[in-house]
Amino acid sequence: MTTPPSSPLSDPRRTEGVHPTHTDLDRLDPLALVQVFTDDQRAAVEAVRAAVPALARAVEAALPRLERGGRLVYVGAGTSGRLAVLDATELTPTFSWPPERAVPLIAGGERAIRQAVEGAEDDAEAGAADVRAAGTGPQDVLIALAASGTTPYVLGAVRAARALGALTIGLANNPGTPLLAAAECPILLDTGPEVISGSTRLKAGTAQKIALNTLSSALMVRLGKVYGNLMVDVKVSNAKLETRALRLTCHATGASEAEARAALAQAGGRVKTALVMLRLGLSAPEAEVRLQAAGGHARVALGEG
């Protein structure tokens, strides 16, 4: 009997395929297993490399909205949702990005971060409702992730966000999927079949993580969150970061440890402010005014263009 095209037995998604090279996986010893899994991760890097033009277009499209005070709204389910939460959460300590401007939405809510919530990803209306409840609007940028490219929760969120005027960026690991068609900025991460068939927490997830790192980091750089390649907007919240702030300030200004400590104390721990203070001989309030006039860009505040 012929299997109809709609049958799950004929799933066309590459991430659901059986990898022909690893059919004896359960017979391998630990060393061989580790080699197989690590070698396969290289496909994730290559998939992201192939997506560089699409990632760059997404950065260019997102920047104007974020410069006007818009938010990053992340949407995903399962592994993709957890990666979305991770990227959104790390923007504040790394770049002092306001937490209210990084909004992660995961199918099933916060409980889904730690455990699977059955059926949550199949609810398109829940995705749309979550986007509306987050107050998504024309200034915002929605980043949607789904390895399959077909997750109803994510598709519902993207369609709702577009209707509300938000910019939509869609990352999927299968070509020709609804998510890539629905998003204004589609990004294909074509990783192919997994070593363990269908386990997209493997290289599909790795590719998504690399792409998210790239996308959000590039945005933060263009928004003035670094000076050179120095993390001058780091949010000092523990001893390790306090030491990092001191080291960065000394490196960027040539100041002594004592001078850098004093400037950081006056600047409330803000490296960027201390940098401008020490380089231009300004007080903390004067440095803050200069930075505000420069749109938060240290290089512009220093008159370096």
Curated annotation (Swiss-Prot):
Residues 62-225 form the SIS domain. Pfam families: GKRP-like_C, GKRP_SIS_N. The keyword Lyase applies. It catalyses: N-acetyl-D-muramate 6-phosphate + H2O = N-acetyl-D-glucosamine 6-phosphate + (R)-lactate. It comes from Deinococcus geothermalis (strain DSM 11300 / CIP 105573 / AG-3a). Specifically catalyzes the cleavage of the D-lactyl ether substituent of MurNAc 6-phosphate, producing GlcNAc 6-phosphate and D-lactate. The lineage of its organism: Bacteria, Thermotogati, Deinococcota, Deinococci, Deinococcales. One of its GO terms (molecular function) is ether hydrolase activity. Pathway: Amino-sugar metabolism; N-acetylmuramate degradation. Keywords: Carbohydrate metabolism, Lyase, Plasmid. Homodimer. The keyword Lyase applies. A lyase-type mechanism (elimination/hydration) is suggested for the cleavage of the lactyl ether bond of MurNAc 6-phosphate, with the formation of an alpha,beta-unsaturated aldehyde intermediate with (E)-stereochemistry, followed by the syn addition of water to give product. This is N-acetylmuramic acid 6-phosphate etherase. The active site is at E90, E121. NCBIfam families: N-acetylmuramic acid 6-phosphate etherase, PRK05441.1, PRK12570.1. Belongs to the GCKR-like family. MurNAc-6-P etherase subfamily. GO terms for biological process: amino sugar catabolic process; N-acetylmuramic acid catabolic process; peptidoglycan turnover. Residues 1-24 are annotated as: Disordered. PROSITE patterns: GCKR (PS01272), SIS (PS51464). It comes from the Bacteria.
